[in-house]
C-alpha cells in the first residue's frame, strides 16, 4: 500500500511537470493571459535592456499618468518582456496597446498592422562583440549569438553583409540577451550581437572581448493605430509620460540614478538574477543613448529623402525578411502620428514637465 502511494505521488508529479507551461513549450508571456480589447491600457516594457528599462520603470511609476488613465476608466497595466519581438503578436491582436520596441520589431509590426510611432526612446549603435580581434573578417563558421527578430539581429545581418556573408555562412545561436556575456566568457559562443547592457558587461568582465562591428540602432514607443483611434486621449497621456520620463532624468544625475535603481529592481524581479551592471555603467549608457540625444523623444526629421528607418526597411526587404507585399508607405504613415505635437501644444492639460513618481 505504501509503495502504491509512492508511485501515485510520482505519477502526480510527472503529470504536473508535463502539463506545466515550461514543459509544454508555452511562452513565458502566455501567463499574462491578456484579453483582446481590455479596459486597461496594457503596455509592454523591456526591463533587461538599457535605457528601455529606465523608461519603462518611470512610465509604470508615473502617478500623473495613472491618475489620468483612471479618470478615463482605463487603468495602466505594464507587462515585462525579454525582447520586443515577443510583443508583436499581442500588439497585432489588440492584446497590448503599446510597447517599447527596437527598430526591427517596429518594422515587422508595421508590416503586419497599422501602428503609430509616438516617440524616440533610444538612438545609438548596437554592437557585435567577440573574443577575437579581427573576427569580422573571419566570421564564416563562427558561433554567433543573437536575439531573433530584434534590432541586434539587424545589426548581425549588417555585419555579415559587410564581409559578403549571409546567415547560412555562420552558426546562429538564439540566446537571451542577459545570458550572452557569460556564454562568451565560457567559450560557448564566438561572439554575440546585442544592445546594452550586454556589450558593456562583456567588455568589463572579459579582457579579450572586443567590439568588432557597430550598427545604428533606435528604439521607439509604438502604439497600435486602433488604440489611437479608439482612445486618442489615453494615447496622448502615454506620450506625455514619455516626455516626462526623459525630462525628469535630464534634470540631474540623482534622478538618473533613481531611474537606474528602479530599472534594476524591475529587471531582477523579472529575471530572478542580480544586476550585472553597475550604477555608473547604467548612467553612462542612459546619457549616451537617450538623455543626451538632442530633442528626444522627437524623432529626427528626414534628411532630404532619407526617412527614419528607410535604410533598415530597404535592407531587410532585399534580404527577404519582410512580406513581399510590404510597402514603405505603411511605415511612413506610422511616423506621421502627431501625438508629440498635440501634447506639447497643450502643456496645462497633459503636464509633460510636471513630475510625480512612486518611490
Language-model features, listed with the residues they occupy:
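Sec/Tat signal peptide C-region and signal peptidase I cleavage site
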Residues: 20-24
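Short, glycine-/small- and polar/acidic-enriched structural segments
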Residues: 25-174, 190-193, 211-215, 340-344, ...
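Short linear loop/turn motifs
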Residues: 77-80, 276-290, 327-339
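Pocket-lining segment of extracytoplasmic ligand-binding domains
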Residues: 105, 172-173, 178-274
Amino acid at each position: 500500500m505504501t509503495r502504491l502511494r509512492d508511485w501515485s505521488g510520482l505519477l502526480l508529479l510527472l503529470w504536473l511537470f508535463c502539463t506545466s507551461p515550461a514543459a509544454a513549450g508555452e511562452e513565458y508571456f502566455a501567463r499574462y493571459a491578456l484579453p483582446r480589447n481590455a479596459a486597461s491600457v496594457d503596455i509592454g516594457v523591456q526591463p533587461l535592456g538599457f535605457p528601455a528599462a529606465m523608461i519603462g520603470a518611470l512610465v509604470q511609476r508615473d502617478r500623473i499618468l495613472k491618475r489620468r488613465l483612471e479618470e478615463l476608466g482605463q487603468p495602466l497595466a505594464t507587462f515585462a518582456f525579454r525582447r520586443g519581438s515577443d510583443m508583436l503578436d499581442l500588439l497585432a491582436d489588440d492584446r497590448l496597446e503599446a510597447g517599447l520596441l527596437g527598430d526591427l520589431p517596429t518594422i515587422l509590426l508595421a508590416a503586419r498592422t497599422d501602428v503609430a510611432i509616438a516617440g524616440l526612446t533610444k538612438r545609438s549603435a548596437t554592437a557585435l562583440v567577440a573574443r577575437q580581434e579581427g573576427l569580422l573578417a573571419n566570421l564564416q563558421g563562427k558561433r554567433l549569438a543573437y536575439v531573433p527578430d530584434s534590432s541586434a539581429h539587424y545589426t548581425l545581418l549588417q555585419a555579415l553583409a559587410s564581409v559578403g556573408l549571409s546567415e547560412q555562412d555562420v552558426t546562429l545561436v538564439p540566446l537571451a540577451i542577459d545570458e550572452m556575456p557569460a556564454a562568451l566568457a565560457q567559450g560557448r559562443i564566438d561572439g554575440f550581437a546585442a544592445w546594452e547592457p550586454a556589450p558593456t558587461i562583456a567588455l568589463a568582465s572579459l579582457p579579450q572581448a572586443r567590439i568588432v562591428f557597430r550598427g545604428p540602432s533606435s528604439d521607439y514607443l509604438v502604439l497600435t493605430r486602433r488604440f489611437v483611434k479608439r482612445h486618442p486621449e489615453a494615447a496622448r497621456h502615454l506620450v506625455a509620460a514619455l516626455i516626462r520620463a526623459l525630462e525628469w532624468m535630464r534634470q540631474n544625475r540623482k534622478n538618473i540614478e533613481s531611474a537606474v535603481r528602479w530599472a534594476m529592481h524591475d529587471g531582477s524581479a523579472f529575471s530572478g538574477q542580480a544586476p550585472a551592471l553597475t550604477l555608473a555603467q547604467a548612467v553612462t549608457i542612459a546619457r549616451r543613448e537617450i538623455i543626451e540625444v538632442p530633442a528626444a523623444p522627437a524623432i529626427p526629421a528626414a534628411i532630404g529623402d532619407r526617412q527614419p528607418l528607410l535604410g533598415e526597411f530597404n535592407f531587410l526587404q532585399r534580404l527577404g525578411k519582410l512580406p513581399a507585399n510590404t510597402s514603405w508607405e505603411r511605415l511612413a504613415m506610422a511616423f506621421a502620428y502627431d501625438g508629440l505635437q498635440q501634447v506639447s501644444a497643450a502643456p496645462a492639460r497633459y503636464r509633460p514637465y510636471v513630475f510625480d513618481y512612486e518611490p
